[in-house]
């Protein structure tokens, strides 16, 4: 293959022979000259005849191709449709959600807490809100502190719940959450 790779148009049918002896042919889906990669939609090997509905998507490194042949050049449409406008509010919402989810995952990790305790921590954060739940160090063990009123010691079961300030509504709510979580885990 020459140092200047040919430019492929999307929709063209291309046949490539790799340095490993593989023959790959299919329709061009994407092409990047900078990294010399070609993404092709190849017919699936499970048959299907003329009504072929499944395809394999193959990524070809053009640096490893010995021979490239354009079997059929795609004819560009006379009128190109403009792409749909980007929905920025939706993208911002997805970004916010992903950031919150990763932050929660990072906050729920504690090296001295069991995976069970970390999962309970994440559930409590979803139930009571992010700033309401914190880890509380106790030597080699770590406890979950809820609203600075309730502490759940390891191994994080209903019998390990301690109340610093008695709040009957909070006590019942925390007990139900922990009980439901424990019953689903075992």
UniProtKB/Swiss-Prot annotation:
Regarding protein family, the annotation reads:
Belongs to the LSM12 family.
Q: Lineage of the native species?
A: Eukaryota, Metazoa, Ecdysozoa, Arthropoda, Hexapoda
Q: Subunit structure of this entry?
A: Interacts with Sbat; along with Sbat and Vlet, may form an accessory subcomplex involved in SMN complex function.
Where in this chain does the record put each Sm domain? 1-74
Disulphides: none
Residues annotated as domain AD: 84-186
Misc remark: When it was originally identified as the potential ortholog of GEMIN6 this protein was named 'Hezron' after the 6th generation descendent of Abraham. This protein is produced by a bicistronic gene which also produces the CG6709 protein from a non-overlapping reading frame.
- Purpose: May have an accessory function in the survival motor neuron (SMN) complex.
Q: Which PROSITE patterns match?
A: AD (PS52001), SM (PS52002)
Q: Which domain of life is it from?
A: Eukaryota
Q: Which CDD domains match?
A: LSm12_N
Q: Which gene encodes it?
A: Hez
**An MF annotation (GO) of this entry:** RNA binding
Return the protein name. LSM12 homolog B
């Amino acid at each position: 293959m020459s140092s200047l790779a040919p430019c492929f148009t999307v929709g063209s049918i291309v046949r490539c022979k790799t340095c490993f002896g593989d023959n790959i042919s299919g329709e061009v889906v994407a092409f990047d000259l900078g990294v010399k990669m070609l993404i092709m939609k190849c017919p699936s090997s499970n048959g299907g005849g003329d009504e072929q509905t499944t395809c394999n998507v193959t990524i070809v490194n053009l640096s490893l191709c010995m021979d490239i042949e354009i079997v059929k050049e795609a004819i560009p449409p006379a009128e190109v449709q403009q792409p749909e406008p980007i929905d920025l509010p939706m993208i911002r919402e997805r970004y916010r959600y992903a950031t919150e989810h990763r932050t929660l995952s990072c906050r729920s990790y504690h090296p001295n807490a069991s995976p069970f305790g970390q999962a309970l921590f994440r559930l409590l954060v979803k139930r009571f809100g992010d700033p309401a739940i914190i880890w509380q160090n106790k030597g080699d063990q770590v406890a979950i502190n809820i609203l600075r009123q309730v502490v759940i010691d390891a191994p994080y079961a209903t019998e390990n719940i301690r109340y610093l300030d008695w709040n009957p509504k909070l006590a019942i709510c925390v007990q139900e959450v922990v009980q439901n979580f424990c019953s689903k885990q075992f």
